[in-house]
Amino acid sequence: VLEDNLRTPSGVSYMLESRNISETLLADIFTETPIMGISDYPNRLKACLASSTSKYDPQVVILTPGRFNSAYYEHAFLAHEMNVPLVHGYDLVVEDSKVYMQGIRGKVQVDVIYRRIDDPYIDPLAFKSDSILGVSGLMSAYRAGNVVIVNAPGTGVADDKSLYPFVPDMIKFYLNEEPILPNIETYQCRKPDDLKYVLDNL
């Protein structure tokens, strides 16, 4: 593991498209070798998102900052593959601490938001007041337990490079499991021995 991206991770659409191309160009290898398929990723992601709420057949949406975002292709790709609406902040409204999507047939309550917008921009009433990307009042609906936001606000703290060396120990402590993938060797320059090693090996 090189780094952890929990805030708004991206790149899976490129992996899926690359695999499709590889399976076409290298069909013999894929036929002869037991390589695990990944084409069910969108359905598994949708099931995982749906399982984050106790509601039966929840309304899941992907919240995008828009087409000028570098990962917009992925947002649209996943929405299409998962068969869920791709929404912008202006498509959603909060009433009585519940989130609704403006639809052709009226408002539809949203149960799970797979957000692809960074924390400071998701709710102008709670964070950056000049944000036009988020949904006014979203955090009040979230705090009331009326909508699930994935990844939850604040998860970006785990992206911090200072936490990276501790992730294997956190997995062992909180999950009582061994990490599946090892981290690369990491030196913390605040530790005298690590600092010495880094300086000696520049």
Predicted regions: what they are:
Residues V1-L202:
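Domain-scale recognition of functional cores that engage charged ligands
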